[in-house]
Amino acid sequence: MTSIHSPVTRKEDTELKRPDLRGKFVCSSCSQNFQHSASLNRHRQLMHSNEHTCMMCERALNQKETIREHMRNEHNLAQVFTCGCCNWTFASKRQLTEHTKCIQGTGAPGDTIPIAKSINAPGSLIQSTIQGTPPVVKTGRKRPMGGSLSPSSSVSTSISSRDASGSPPPTEEEAERKVLFDNAVDTILQSKFFTYQQITEVDTWVKIIESANTLADTLQRIKKSQKVKAEGPAVESKMIPEKHVKQEIE
């Protein structure tokens, strides 16, 4: 396994997963240049992890641990989502999306509560802010057969939250379970059952995770049962009644 202190090897264009997104991406902490946004995000995780402070244990990370390792080992969070424009970290993808929309719309971080913050101000890691101009990116987009370029194929600065471990993609059942868990965490947080101070405490997150897992397992069992019986309305997994959340937490 590569040491966390080893220099980040720069890949050739042919080795990049998306060579069409090659451009100039600058690290705001050390001014090192990268040809791909994913390489810059990985560099930040490996070389500047000590810029993070965990809001759950109020401890600054050291350079020997990444934010993902810290959340997994110290707080039992198997997956977290880090914003590429400020390196704030959130417990669910939905929270990251809400935070990103606020940054893009108003320049403010919004009301979504992160589980870890960095020394970087919200939006300060956006390449147009660092470089003073939008990053130069070679699109290299391919024209679909018999049609024009799709608007959805436009290129923007990547905000990556994927782990670069090379793990196999999750199964359909695992992906569904993850969605149910994320929705449960979101519902618990949005229910305002806990105060802001409580959310920064480890014991609170242990309760949140246990409750979210229980809710996710219950919903998944119900969905499986309904598929087998092939009757009755489908269970709505996107919203979880608040009364069930309170029952699980209490």
Swiss-Prot record:
Zinc finger extent (C2H2-type): 25-48, 52-75, 81-104
Matches recorded under PROSITE patterns: ZINC_FINGER_C2H2_1, ZINC_FINGER_C2H2_2
Record's compositionally biased regions (Low complexity): 148-165
Residue ranges with Basic and acidic residues bias: 239-250
Classification via Gene3D superfamilies: Classic Zinc Finger (3.30.160.60)
Superkingdom as given in the UniProt entry: Eukaryota
Record flagged with keyword Zinc: yes
Any GO BP: regulation of transcription by RNA polymerase II
UniProt entry keywords in alphabetical sequence: Metal-binding, Repeat, Zinc, Zinc-finger
UniProt KW DNA-binding keyword: no
Function: Involved in regulating left/right asymmetric differentiation of the gustatory ASE neurons. Plays a role in modulating expression of LIM/homeobox protein lim-6.
Protein name, entry field: Zinc finger protein lsy-27
Biological source species: Caenorhabditis elegans
Lineage: Eukaryota, Metazoa, Ecdysozoa, Nematoda, Chromadorea
